[in-house]
Protein backbone atom coordinates (compact mmCIF):
# COMPACT_ATOMS: atom_id res chain seq x y z
CA UNK A 1 0.00 0.00 0.00
CA UNK A 2 1.63 3.21 -1.20
CA UNK A 3 1.26 6.70 0.23
CA UNK A 4 -1.71 8.53 -1.29
CA UNK A 5 -0.79 10.31 -4.50
CA UNK A 6 -1.69 13.96 -5.05
CA UNK A 7 -2.79 15.58 -8.30
CA UNK A 8 0.54 17.42 -8.79
CA UNK A 9 2.36 14.14 -8.20
CA UNK A 10 0.51 12.60 -11.16
CA UNK A 11 2.24 15.11 -13.43
CA UNK A 12 5.53 14.62 -11.64
CA UNK A 13 5.34 10.86 -12.24
CA UNK A 14 5.15 11.54 -15.98
CA UNK A 15 8.29 13.66 -15.78
CA UNK A 16 10.04 10.83 -13.92
CA UNK A 17 8.91 8.21 -16.42
CA UNK A 18 6.83 6.37 -13.83
CA UNK A 19 3.56 4.69 -14.87
CA UNK A 20 0.22 5.49 -13.25
CA UNK A 21 -2.03 2.54 -12.36
CA UNK A 22 -5.80 3.17 -12.31
CA UNK A 23 -8.64 0.69 -11.81
CA UNK A 24 -12.39 1.02 -11.45
CA UNK A 25 -14.23 0.27 -8.22
CA UNK A 26 -17.88 0.78 -7.38
CA UNK A 27 -18.26 -0.42 -3.79
CA UNK A 28 -16.58 -0.66 -0.38
CA UNK A 29 -15.18 -4.24 -0.57
CA UNK A 30 -13.38 -3.73 -3.87
CA UNK A 31 -12.21 -0.26 -2.82
CA UNK A 32 -10.64 -1.80 0.30
CA UNK A 33 -8.80 -4.36 -1.81
CA UNK A 34 -7.53 -1.72 -4.22
CA UNK A 35 -6.45 0.46 -1.30
CA UNK A 36 -4.32 -2.44 -0.05
CA UNK A 37 -2.62 -2.77 -3.45
CA UNK A 38 0.01 -0.67 -5.22
CA UNK A 39 -2.55 1.01 -7.51
CA UNK A 40 -2.56 4.82 -7.25
CA UNK A 41 -5.98 5.81 -8.61
CA UNK A 42 -9.52 4.47 -8.38
CA UNK A 43 -12.01 5.53 -11.03
CA UNK A 44 -15.65 5.27 -10.03
CA UNK A 45 -16.72 4.94 -13.63
CA UNK A 46 -20.17 5.39 -15.03
CA UNK A 47 -19.39 1.95 -16.44
CA UNK A 48 -21.14 0.89 -13.24
CA UNK A 49 -24.31 1.30 -15.29
CA UNK A 50 -23.46 -1.83 -17.25
CA UNK A 51 -21.18 -3.64 -14.81
CA UNK A 52 -23.22 -3.17 -11.61
CA UNK A 53 -26.69 -1.89 -12.49
CA UNK A 54 -27.34 -3.96 -15.60
CA UNK A 55 -28.07 -1.11 -18.02
CA UNK A 56 -27.30 -1.50 -21.72
CA UNK A 57 -25.05 1.57 -21.73
CA UNK A 58 -23.67 4.30 -19.47
CA UNK A 59 -26.28 6.83 -20.62
CA UNK A 60 -29.03 5.99 -18.05
CA UNK A 61 -26.70 6.46 -15.06
CA UNK A 62 -27.84 9.35 -12.87
CA UNK A 63 -25.94 11.82 -10.74
CA UNK A 64 -27.52 10.36 -7.60
CA UNK A 65 -26.41 6.86 -8.59
CA UNK A 66 -22.85 8.06 -9.10
CA UNK A 67 -22.78 9.80 -5.73
CA UNK A 68 -24.28 6.72 -4.06
CA UNK A 69 -21.45 4.53 -5.38
CA UNK A 70 -18.71 7.09 -4.79
CA UNK A 71 -19.39 7.29 -1.06
CA UNK A 72 -18.45 3.71 -0.13
CA UNK A 73 -15.45 3.78 -2.45
CA UNK A 74 -14.07 6.87 -0.72
CA UNK A 75 -14.66 5.26 2.68
CA UNK A 76 -12.94 2.07 1.58
CA UNK A 77 -9.90 3.71 0.00
CA UNK A 78 -8.50 6.44 2.25
CA UNK A 79 -5.00 5.97 0.80
CA UNK A 80 -5.99 6.10 -2.87
CA UNK A 81 -6.83 9.02 -5.16
CA UNK A 82 -10.50 8.64 -6.13
CA UNK A 83 -11.79 10.13 -9.39
CA UNK A 84 -15.37 9.75 -10.64
CA UNK A 85 -17.16 10.09 -13.95
CA UNK A 86 -19.70 12.83 -14.33
CA UNK A 87 -22.70 11.02 -15.83
CA UNK A 88 -24.29 11.88 -19.15
CA UNK A 89 -26.47 14.98 -18.90
CA UNK A 90 -24.78 16.31 -15.77
CA UNK A 91 -22.15 18.48 -17.49
CA UNK A 92 -23.06 18.82 -21.17
CA UNK A 93 -26.08 21.14 -20.80
CA UNK A 94 -24.36 24.24 -19.46
CA UNK A 95 -21.23 25.27 -17.59
CA UNK A 96 -23.37 26.26 -14.63
CA UNK A 97 -24.93 22.81 -14.49
CA UNK A 98 -21.51 21.21 -14.73
CA UNK A 99 -20.13 23.25 -11.82
CA UNK A 100 -23.23 22.67 -9.70
CA UNK A 101 -23.23 18.92 -10.28
CA UNK A 102 -19.48 18.50 -9.86
CA UNK A 103 -19.69 20.39 -6.58
CA UNK A 104 -22.36 17.93 -5.43
CA UNK A 105 -20.15 14.99 -6.30
CA UNK A 106 -17.15 16.35 -4.40
CA UNK A 107 -19.10 17.64 -1.40
CA UNK A 108 -21.45 14.69 -0.91
CA UNK A 109 -19.12 11.80 -1.70
CA UNK A 110 -15.61 12.97 -0.89
CA UNK A 111 -14.04 12.24 -4.28
CA UNK A 112 -11.14 14.48 -5.28
CA UNK A 113 -11.66 14.91 -9.03
CA UNK A 114 -14.18 14.35 -11.79
CA UNK A 115 -13.78 12.91 -15.28
CA UNK A 116 -15.63 14.26 -18.30
CA UNK A 117 -15.80 12.92 -21.84
CA UNK A 118 -15.13 15.05 -24.90
CA UNK A 119 -12.38 17.08 -26.50
CA UNK A 120 -12.28 20.53 -28.05
CA UNK A 121 -16.00 21.15 -27.67
CA UNK A 122 -15.84 20.26 -23.99
CA UNK A 123 -12.73 22.33 -23.25
CA UNK A 124 -14.67 25.48 -22.20
CA UNK A 125 -16.61 23.41 -19.65
CA UNK A 126 -13.37 21.89 -18.36
CA UNK A 127 -11.94 25.39 -17.96
CA UNK A 128 -15.04 26.51 -16.07
CA UNK A 129 -14.79 23.52 -13.73
CA UNK A 130 -11.09 24.07 -13.10
CA UNK A 131 -11.64 27.78 -12.50
CA UNK A 132 -14.28 26.80 -9.93
CA UNK A 133 -11.66 24.75 -8.08
CA UNK A 134 -12.73 21.34 -9.36
CA UNK A 135 -9.93 19.06 -10.64
CA UNK A 136 -10.77 17.46 -14.00
CA UNK A 137 -9.55 14.38 -15.83
CA UNK A 138 -10.34 14.44 -19.55
CA UNK A 139 -11.39 11.52 -21.77
CA UNK A 140 -10.94 11.31 -25.55
CA UNK A 141 -11.09 8.66 -28.25
CA UNK A 142 -13.93 6.25 -27.73
CA UNK A 143 -16.28 8.11 -25.39
CA UNK A 144 -18.91 5.60 -24.21
CA UNK A 145 -21.55 8.22 -23.36
CA UNK A 146 -21.66 9.26 -27.03
CA UNK A 147 -20.71 5.93 -28.60
CA UNK A 148 -23.81 5.93 -30.80
CA UNK A 149 -22.69 9.22 -32.33
CA UNK A 150 -19.30 7.66 -33.04
CA UNK A 151 -20.81 4.65 -34.79
CA UNK A 152 -20.65 2.27 -31.85
CA UNK A 153 -17.90 0.84 -29.67
CA UNK A 154 -15.02 0.82 -32.13
CA UNK A 155 -11.49 2.14 -32.52
CA UNK A 156 -11.23 5.90 -33.06
CA UNK A 157 -8.61 8.00 -34.84
CA UNK A 158 -7.93 5.61 -37.72
CA UNK A 159 -7.97 8.28 -40.45
CA UNK A 160 -5.60 11.23 -40.76
CA UNK A 161 -8.34 13.76 -40.06
CA UNK A 162 -9.68 11.81 -37.08
CA UNK A 163 -6.19 11.38 -35.64
CA UNK A 164 -5.44 15.10 -35.99
CA UNK A 165 -8.72 15.93 -34.28
CA UNK A 166 -7.85 13.71 -31.31
CA UNK A 167 -4.48 15.42 -30.97
CA UNK A 168 -6.21 18.80 -31.03
CA UNK A 169 -8.73 17.52 -28.47
CA UNK A 170 -5.94 16.49 -26.11
CA UNK A 171 -4.12 19.81 -26.45
CA UNK A 172 -7.37 21.71 -25.86
CA UNK A 173 -8.07 19.76 -22.67
CA UNK A 174 -4.55 20.38 -21.40
CA UNK A 175 -4.90 24.10 -22.12
CA UNK A 176 -8.24 24.09 -20.30
CA UNK A 177 -6.54 22.82 -17.15
CA UNK A 178 -7.18 19.07 -17.11
CA UNK A 179 -4.65 17.29 -14.88
CA UNK A 180 -4.67 14.10 -16.98
CA UNK A 181 -6.47 12.54 -19.94
CA UNK A 182 -7.86 9.06 -20.54
CA UNK A 183 -7.31 7.86 -24.11
CA UNK A 184 -9.65 5.03 -25.06
CA UNK A 185 -9.53 2.70 -28.07
CA UNK A 186 -7.15 4.49 -30.40
CA UNK A 187 -4.16 3.10 -32.34
CA UNK A 188 -1.05 2.75 -30.21
CA UNK A 189 1.04 5.00 -32.45
CA UNK A 190 -1.47 7.82 -32.19
CA UNK A 191 -1.61 7.47 -28.41
CA UNK A 192 2.19 7.70 -28.35
CA UNK A 193 2.12 10.93 -30.37
CA UNK A 194 -0.57 12.46 -28.16
CA UNK A 195 1.28 11.43 -25.00
CA UNK A 196 4.53 12.97 -26.24
CA UNK A 197 2.71 16.21 -27.12
CA UNK A 198 1.38 16.79 -23.60
CA UNK A 199 2.94 17.78 -20.29
CA UNK A 200 0.08 16.09 -18.39
CA UNK A 201 -0.16 12.30 -18.08
CA UNK A 202 -2.25 10.13 -20.36
CA UNK A 203 -3.97 6.99 -19.11
CA UNK A 204 -4.77 4.42 -21.73
CA UNK A 205 -7.46 1.81 -22.14
CA UNK A 206 -7.20 0.02 -25.44
CA UNK A 207 -4.61 2.61 -26.50
CA UNK A 208 -1.42 0.56 -26.45
CA UNK A 209 1.66 0.64 -24.20
CA UNK A 210 2.90 4.20 -24.74
CA UNK A 211 0.53 6.10 -22.45
CA UNK A 212 1.75 7.30 -19.06
CA UNK A 213 -0.62 4.92 -17.29
CA UNK A 214 -3.30 2.30 -17.79
CA UNK A 215 -6.84 1.70 -16.57
CA UNK A 216 -9.10 -1.35 -16.65
CA UNK A 217 -12.53 -2.23 -15.30
CA UNK A 218 -11.89 -4.33 -12.21
CA UNK A 219 -14.48 -6.97 -13.15
CA UNK A 220 -12.71 -7.41 -16.50
CA UNK A 221 -9.29 -7.70 -14.86
CA UNK A 222 -10.59 -10.33 -12.43
CA UNK A 223 -12.44 -12.33 -15.06
CA UNK A 224 -15.81 -12.05 -13.34
CA UNK A 225 -17.71 -11.57 -16.60
CA UNK A 226 -16.28 -14.05 -19.08
CA UNK A 227 -18.93 -14.04 -21.82
CA UNK A 228 -17.30 -11.15 -23.66
CA UNK A 229 -13.70 -10.05 -23.22
CA UNK A 230 -12.63 -6.90 -25.12
CA UNK A 231 -9.40 -7.20 -27.11
CA UNK A 232 -7.61 -4.70 -24.86
CA UNK A 233 -8.43 -6.57 -21.62
CA UNK A 234 -5.99 -8.92 -19.91
CA UNK A 235 -7.68 -11.15 -17.35
CA UNK A 236 -5.29 -11.52 -14.41
CA UNK A 237 -7.62 -14.01 -12.72
CA UNK A 238 -10.61 -16.19 -13.58
CA UNK A 239 -12.84 -15.47 -10.62
CA UNK A 240 -16.15 -15.85 -12.44
CA UNK A 241 -15.89 -19.65 -12.72
CA UNK A 242 -14.54 -19.86 -9.16
CA UNK A 243 -17.50 -17.84 -7.82
CA UNK A 244 -20.01 -19.98 -9.69
CA UNK A 245 -18.35 -23.15 -8.40
CA UNK A 246 -18.49 -21.86 -4.82
CA UNK A 247 -22.17 -20.95 -5.16
CA UNK A 248 -22.99 -24.40 -6.53
CA UNK A 249 -20.99 -26.09 -3.75
CA UNK A 250 -22.97 -24.10 -1.18
CA UNK A 251 -26.30 -24.95 -2.83
CA UNK A 252 -25.38 -28.64 -2.97
CA UNK A 253 -24.24 -28.84 0.66
CA UNK A 254 -27.38 -27.10 1.93
CA UNK A 255 -29.57 -29.46 -0.11
CA UNK A 256 -27.65 -32.50 1.19
CA UNK A 257 -27.65 -31.33 4.82
CA UNK A 258 -23.86 -31.09 4.88
CA UNK A 259 -23.79 -27.38 5.70
CA UNK A 260 -23.87 -26.16 8.38
CA UNK A 261 -21.79 -28.82 10.13
CA UNK A 262 -20.85 -29.02 13.81
CA UNK A 263 -17.91 -26.67 13.24
CA UNK A 264 -20.34 -23.97 12.06
CA UNK A 265 -22.88 -24.43 14.86
CA UNK A 266 -23.04 -23.08 18.41
CA UNK A 267 -23.15 -25.39 21.41
CA UNK A 268 -25.14 -25.07 24.63
CA UNK A 269 -23.95 -24.91 28.25
CA UNK A 270 -24.06 -28.28 30.04
CA UNK A 271 -26.83 -27.25 32.46
CA UNK A 272 -29.05 -26.32 29.53
CA UNK A 273 -28.58 -29.45 27.44
CA UNK A 274 -31.32 -31.42 29.16
CA UNK A 275 -33.86 -28.69 28.62
CA UNK A 276 -33.53 -28.45 24.85
UniProtKB/Swiss-Prot annotation:
Where, in this chain's numbering, is 3-methyl-2-oxobutanoate bound?
46-47, 85, 115
Q: Which domain of life is it from?
A: Bacteria
Q: How is the cofactor bound?
A: Binds 1 Mg(2+) ion per subunit.
- Which subcellular locations apply to this protein? Cytoplasm
Question: Which pathway does it take part in?
Answer: Cofactor biosynthesis; (R)-pantothenate biosynthesis; (R)-pantoate from 3-methyl-2-oxobutanoate: step 1/2
Where does it sit, as one GO cellular component term?
Answer: cytoplasm
The chemistry this enzyme catalyses reads: 3-methyl-2-oxobutanoate + (6R)-5,10-methylene-5,6,7,8-tetrahydrofolate + H2O = 2-dehydropantoate + (6S)-5,6,7,8-tetrahydrofolate
Which cofactor is recorded for it? Mg(2+)
Active-site residues, Swiss-Prot/TrEMBL: 184
> What PANTHER family does the record tag this protein with?
3-METHYL-2-OXOBUTANOATE HYDROXYMETHYLTRANSFERASE
The function of this protein is: Catalyzes the reversible reaction in which hydroxymethyl group from 5,10-methylenetetrahydrofolate is transferred onto alpha-ketoisovalerate to form ketopantoate.
| Entry protein name | 3-methyl-2-oxobutanoate hydroxymethyltransferase
The source organism is Heliobacterium modesticaldum (strain ATCC 51547 / Ice1)
Amino acid sequence: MAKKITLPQCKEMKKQGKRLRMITAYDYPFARLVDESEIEIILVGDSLGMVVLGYDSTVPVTLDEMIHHCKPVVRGAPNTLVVADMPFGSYNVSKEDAIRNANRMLKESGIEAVKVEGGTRMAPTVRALVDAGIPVMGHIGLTPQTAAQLGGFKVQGKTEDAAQQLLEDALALESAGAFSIVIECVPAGLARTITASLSIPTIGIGAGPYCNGQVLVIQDLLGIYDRFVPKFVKQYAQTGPAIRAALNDYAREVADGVFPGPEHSFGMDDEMKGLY
